Amino acid sequence: MAELKLGYKASAEQFAPRELVELAVAAEAHGMDSATVSDHFQPWRHQGGHAPFSLSWMTAVGERTNRLLLGTSVLTPTFRYNPAVIAQAFATMGCLYPNRVFLGVGTGEALNEIATGYEGAWPEFKERFARLRESVGLMRQLWSGDRVDFDGDYYRLKGASIYDVPDGGVPVYIAAGGPAVAKYAGRAGDGFICTSGKGEELYTEKLMPAVREGAAAADRSVDGIDKMIEIKISYDPDPELALNNTRFWAPLSLTAEQKHSIDDPIEMEKAADALPIEQIAKRWIVASDPDEAVEKVGQYVTWGLNHLVFHAPGHDQRRFLELFQSDLAPRLRRLG
């Protein structure tokens, strides 16, 4: 069984750059094994929203910490970015912080790409997935250190080389919400990323079997794949506070279709704020009792996930980190 790891999700949509760095430093001080960050050009909420650049944040945190594993959860290397430039950026960070950096990738959302110049109708999943696969292949060729000519359907390189590359390249974690990408993660990913709160059947009957199927098809051991889940948890001894803390993150409760099609934070905020608190809270583990919280988290370990990254919705993140260290972490470590 893969090693159990506990991580912290740095909420880039909620906090300004300096505070976001300090929270990751605090996460290491409170015993977390990893810290991940989303890569949004625009946040999901216009009022009070933030969107610091993920790679600047990773470098700043890397300089301030000693052992945290740092990565994106997730970045889309296929539209507003050239994947070759992303490969260069992560190779540099991999050299600066050896064995502490991974690249988490996904297929993308219109919210981040339309504003930065993508023209035409937002591509359907088939094209976005094809772009992702091609970009991962391109980046891995560059991380070999060789001189690369690449002529793909979407990207091209001519005599390209990255001169500073960490030994072994950069681990790529692939985010999936369905079995097709999960199978690809099992076949080609160093890690797999999913999110909590979507019903047991998704994990036990679709995602995890697909990861195993992909690994088997590539003659790989699934134990060698870091299986990460971003767990949405609002834990506080005050039940009312635990519930109301979820309000800021109402956009998470919009449907996937809504989130993928809306390209304006103002419109996203308007749609999200129309939701009742009860619907918003359904995406979260809302708990005031530590044993209840750990029982709900523990099911994901039972289902085969080993790297638990905790996303807390409240504005007082230091309170969450203190409560996590005292109330939840000792119980969670025993699950491993």
Curated annotation (Swiss-Prot):
Name the protein family. Answer: Belongs to the F420-dependent glucose-6-phosphate dehydrogenase family.
Taxonomic classification: Bacteria, Bacillati, Actinomycetota, Actinomycetes, Mycobacteriales
Protein name in UniProt: F420-dependent glucose-6-phosphate dehydrogenase
Which EC numbers characterise this protein's activity in its record?
1.1.98.2
Q: Give the keywords, sorted.
A: Carbohydrate metabolism, Oxidoreductase
Q: HAMAP family, per this entry?
A: F420_G6P_DH
The catalytic activity, as recorded, is: oxidized coenzyme F420-(gamma-L-Glu)(n) + D-glucose 6-phosphate + H(+) = 6-phospho-D-glucono-1,5-lactone + reduced coenzyme F420-(gamma-L-Glu)(n)
Q: Which residues bind substrate?
A: 195, 198, 259, 283
Q: How would you summarize its activity regulation?
A: Inhibited by citrate.
Q: What does this protein do?
A: Catalyzes the coenzyme F420-dependent oxidation of glucose 6-phosphate to 6-phosphogluconolactone. Appears to have a role in resistance to oxidative stress, via its consumption of G6P that serves as a source of reducing power to combat oxidative stress in mycobacteria. More precisely, is likely involved in a F420-dependent anti-oxidant mechanism that protects M.tuberculosis against oxidative stress and bactericidal agents. Is essential for the bioreductive activation of the bicyclic 4-nitroimidazole prodrug PA-824 (a nitroimidazo-oxazine) developed for anti-tuberculosis therapy against both replicating and persistent bacteria. It does not interact directly with PA-824 but, rather, provides reduced F420 to the deazaflavin-dependent nitroreductase Ddn, which in turn activates PA-824.
**What are the GO MF terms of this UniProt record?**
coenzyme F420 binding; glucose-6-phosphate dehydrogenase (coenzyme F420) activity; oxidoreductase activity, acting on CH-OH group of donors; oxidoreductase activity, acting on paired donors, with incorporation or reduction of molecular oxygen
Instruction: Tell me which Gene Ontology terms the entry assigns under biological process.
Output: carbohydrate metabolic process; cell redox homeostasis
Q: Which domain of life is it from?
A: Bacteria
Disruption of the gene: reported phenotype = Cells lacking this gene display a strong resistance to PA-824 and CGI-17341 (a nitroimidazo-oxazole).
- One Pfam family this sequence matches: Bac_luciferase
Q: Name one GO cellular component term.
A: plasma membrane
Activity's dependence on pH: Optimum pH is 6.5-7.
Locate the active site.
40, 109
Per UniProt, subunit arrangement is: Homodimer.
Provide the residue positions that the database annotates as binding coenzyme F420-(gamma-Glu)n.
Answer: 39, 76, 107-108, 112, 177-178, 180-181
InterPro entries named in the record: F420-dep_G6P_DH (IPR019944), F420-G6PD/mer (IPR050564), F420_G6P_DH-rel (IPR019945), Luciferase-like_dom (IPR011251), Luciferase-like_sf (IPR036661)
